[in-house]
């Protein structure tokens, strides 16, 4: 019977990819318990769906039948589509849906599904850094650059190193870079608790006491400061479309802009006059669209950076007013320039930039003249024009989100003003909703270039509107747009590279790093679908794949009106953008914060590759952990010490252990200690030397092994409800394995590095053998130098017979006694982790 159940579950997990004509699209990241949860059923043939099932992924049992189904008709090649609403179900766990003949991928429902996702996006921002690039551990474009279009400085050198490359190319624009900075500052301002510290200011691994998003903001503002070297002198762009020569590492970029190969790039001055656009001229009419962005970033940056970099904060504070005043004196748009083609960012609006600059100056200075000016600018463009439109030129109305309306509406003490700008925000949302209601994905975003950036903008506007008003009228569309980005779309793919790592995501983004086999564009948001008419009009598009991997053209799923391809040669739909990626940080951090509120806790754990490796470092607690597969000769000694001092511990066992060491398991459970899974078969998941490059097990093998372990654990009353923490076999894993664990509703945990306690299993014949005295000494050295707050301290319940120096016999008692005397408290992981 056991084998039949396992076979049935394996079929269920793979059926969604094998079924000939029906699929269920879901958010691959999962869902918060108290949130809108709607999947989309699609079928190539006509299908009648009146109900659907929610199935427990661990047991294969249906936990609820739903009849909350809405027929949304045909869509593209799909003759039948339905929206499947299961929002009323809130129990934590791992599930999949069944409707018709389709089975969805597995997904979790829990309060921490978005934890770490905003920080994950910063991987791409670090990868895009110009100057020193931490991803490559090398520097690029060190000689930027030479001034263009300045009345007296043209041809002179200017130091504008730093910032971020815009996308798959290496151009740099103030327009997109400033928007990226502001979006990250908004995210940090509104949700500071959602950001961690794992990297230093240069983007290298290692905490520096400053949240990583603040490090990234500072990196951007340093560059923006250089792009404004003197009062009234502002620059709009570095390099131009001559950059589009080939895929190459930025370190080896030798494009010649007329100054010699790789010896410097043009830096375009904000002249306020038309500049080159291929054979023509761009439509520049002033500088306010750019200097307004300088103003908002400098003003908000002065507030955000003051606790970390007070001198620099004061410097940009003084610059903010000058940037704004320059825009007042030279109103109009400052478009980008091109040389070889007519491709530019065709921004035509500028009052939104001045509105945001003015309101941020008001918040910085308290001077009411800035608020009055912000209101006047805001009234000139009450709604961002793309919202509700069918099309737009490339970056015609930018930024895609006008945060100025939100900031004005947030000003305390003026209800009339707040109501006016809330109405403006609602108008844009309402127009988008009107276009969305007939779509099975509730998707009303125009499929123009960078449609995913527009999607992100609308999600953010919906969330900001709901935050101001509490109005839930548009919450289902907000959820649909959120879910669109993570797989609830016609193609069933996430639009964020490697998020979730164990899911379906862009594997061939249009990036030189991918083409040159340097790595993936991790964390990057790709452009997203475009209208078929746009795609068919583009030059140089190639749907061929990489030499070592086939592309995914999704031919079977392409709607008639739009296309998306996971192919490195498709720069229109599969190129990650720096500004789009940064714009995810607000809504992702907000979702993490909402999850914390639902859980009633703040996540202060430290993570590595998706696994918790340390609990709250501000708490003087230790989670003592013992793992075991076959050896357990130390059980009596360990339990004797724990009983002697009345401390709790945590135990992770394999299926083999549960089946053969039942009396030990029962003794531990009787004590009230945490008991969790260490896998069933103690499989080796990864290549230990290259953990992220090679995974030895498939997703199905991993899940089947875990389910088998929980089936055995169930005999002891241990279920996912009371044992959701999982420690991998050999204490080795990668981000893919952690992602698979997340899908199953598990939280992967591992020991805290630094003490060497896990070496208590080593035997004298090994080169890396460590004796118990040395291990104890290393633990106490770490305690003395860095403290053990929040440590997950790993030991083994048994070791090979060749090891006669058993730590639990000789030093465990001393270790526990000493740490207790130093004021540490031994806790269960459930208490220490906090969720």
Please identify what each model-predicted range represents.
Residues 202-213:
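Acidic, glycine-anchored loop motifs typical of Ca2+
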Residues 213-238:
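Carboxylate/His-rich catalytic cores and anion/metal-binding grooves
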Residues 291, 295-305, 313-363, 392-409:
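Aromatic-lined, polymer-binding surfaces characteristic
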Residues 28-100, 105, 111, 126-179, ...:
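Aromatic (Trp/Tyr) and acidic
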């Amino acid at each position: 019977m056991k084998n039949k159940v396992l076979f049935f579950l394996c079929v269920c997990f793979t059926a969604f990819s094998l079924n000939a004509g029906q699929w269920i699209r879901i958010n691959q990241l999962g869902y918060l318990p108290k949130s809108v949860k709607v999947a989309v059923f699609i079928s190539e043939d006509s299908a009648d769906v009146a109900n659907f099932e929610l199935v427990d992924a661990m047991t294969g049992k249906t936990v609820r039948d739903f009849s909350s189904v809405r027929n949304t008709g045909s869509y593209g090649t799909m003759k039948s589509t339905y929206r499947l609403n299961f929002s009323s179900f809130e129990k934590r766990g791992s599930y999949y849906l069944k409707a018709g003949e389709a089975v969805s991928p597995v997904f979790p429902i829990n309060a921490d599904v978005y934890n770490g996702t905003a920080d994950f996006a910063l991987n791409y921002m670090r990868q895009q850094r110009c100057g020193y690039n931490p991803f490559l551990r090398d520097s690029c474009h060190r000689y930027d650059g030479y001034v263009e279009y300045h009345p007296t400085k043209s041809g002179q050198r200017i130091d504008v190193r730093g910032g971020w490359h815009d996308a798959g190319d290496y151009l740099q624009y103030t327009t997109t870079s400033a928007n990226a900075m502001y979006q990250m500052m908004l995210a940090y301002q509104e949700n500071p608790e959602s950001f961690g510290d794992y990297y230093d200011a240069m983007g290298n691994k290692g905490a520096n006491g400053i949240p990583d998003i603040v490090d990234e903001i500072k990196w951007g503002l340093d560059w923006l400061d250089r792009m404004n070297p003197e009062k009234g002198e502002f620059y709009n762009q570095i390099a131009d479309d001559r950059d589009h020569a080939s895929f190459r590492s930025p370190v080896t970029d030798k494009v010649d802009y007329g100054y010699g190969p790789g010896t410097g790039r043009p830096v375009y001055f904000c002249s306020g006059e038309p500049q080159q656009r291929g054979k023509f001229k761009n439509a520049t009419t002033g500088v306010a669209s750019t200097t307004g962005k300088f103003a908002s970033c400098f003003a908000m940056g002065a507030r955000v950076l003051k606790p970390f970099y007070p001198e620099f904060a004061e410097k940009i504070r003084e610059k903010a007013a000058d940037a704004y005043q320059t825009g007042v004196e030279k109103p109009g748009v400052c478009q980008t320039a091109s040389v070889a083609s007519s491709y530019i960012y065709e921004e035509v609006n500028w009052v939104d930039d001045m509105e945001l600059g003015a309101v941020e100056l008001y918040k910085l200075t308290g001077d009411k003249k800035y608020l009055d000016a912000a209101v006047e600018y805001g009234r000139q463009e009450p709604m961002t024009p793309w919202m509700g439109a069918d099309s737009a030129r490339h970056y015609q109305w930018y930024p895609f989100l006008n945060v100025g309306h939100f900031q004005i509406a947030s000003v305390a003490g003026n209800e009339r003003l707040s109501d006016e700008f809330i109405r403006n925000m609602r108008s844009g949302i309402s127009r988008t909703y009107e276009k969305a209601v007939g779509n099975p994905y509730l998707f009303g975003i125009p499929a123009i270039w960078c449609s995913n950036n527009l999607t992100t903008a609308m999600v953010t506007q919906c969330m900001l509107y709901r935050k101001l008003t509490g109005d839930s009228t548009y919450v289902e569309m907000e959820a649909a747009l959120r879910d669109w980005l993570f797989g609830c779309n016609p193609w069933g793919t996430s639009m964020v590279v490697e998020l979730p790592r164990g899911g379906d995501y862009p594997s061939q983004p249009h990036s030189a790093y991918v083409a040159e086999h340097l790595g993936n564009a991790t964390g990057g948001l790709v452009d997203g679908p475009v209208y078929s008419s746009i795609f068919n009009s583009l030059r140089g598009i190639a749907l061929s794949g990489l030499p070592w991997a086939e592309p995914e053209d999704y031919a079977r799923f392409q709607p008639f009106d739009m296309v998306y391809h996971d192919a490195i040669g498709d720069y229109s739909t599969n190129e990650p953008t720096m500004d789009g990626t940064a714009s995810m940080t607000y809504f992702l951090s907000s979702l993490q914060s909402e999850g914390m509120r639902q859980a009633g806790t703040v996540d202060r754990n430290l993570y590595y590759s998706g696994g918790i490796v340390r609990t709250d470092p501000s708490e003087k607690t230790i989670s003592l952990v013992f793992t075991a597969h076959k050896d357990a000769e130390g059980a009596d000694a360990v339990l004797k010490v724990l009983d002697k001092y009345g401390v709790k511990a945590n135990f992770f066992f394999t299926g083999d252990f549960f089946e053969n060491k039942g009396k030990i398991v029962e003794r531990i459970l009787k004590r009230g200690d945490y008991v969790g899974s260490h896998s069933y078969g103690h499989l080796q998941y990864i290549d230990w030397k290259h953990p992220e490059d090679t995974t030895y097990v498939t997703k199905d093998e991993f899940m089947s092994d875990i389910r088998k372990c929980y089936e055995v654990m169930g005999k002891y009353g241990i279920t996912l409800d009371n044992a959701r923490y999982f420690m991998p076999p050999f204490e080795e894993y990668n981000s893919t394995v952690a992602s698979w664990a997340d899908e199953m509703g598990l939280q992967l945990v591992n020991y805290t590095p630094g003490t060497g306690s896990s070496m208590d299993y080593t035997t004298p014949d090994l080169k890396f053998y460590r004796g118990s005295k040395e291990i104890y000494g290393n633990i106490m050295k770490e305690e003395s130098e860095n403290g053990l707050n929040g440590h997950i301290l790993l030991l083994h319940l048994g070791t090979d017979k060749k090891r006669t120096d058993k730590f639990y016999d000789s030093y465990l008692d001393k270790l526990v006694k000493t740490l207790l005397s130093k004021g540490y408290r031994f806790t269960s992981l459930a208490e220490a982790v906090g969720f």
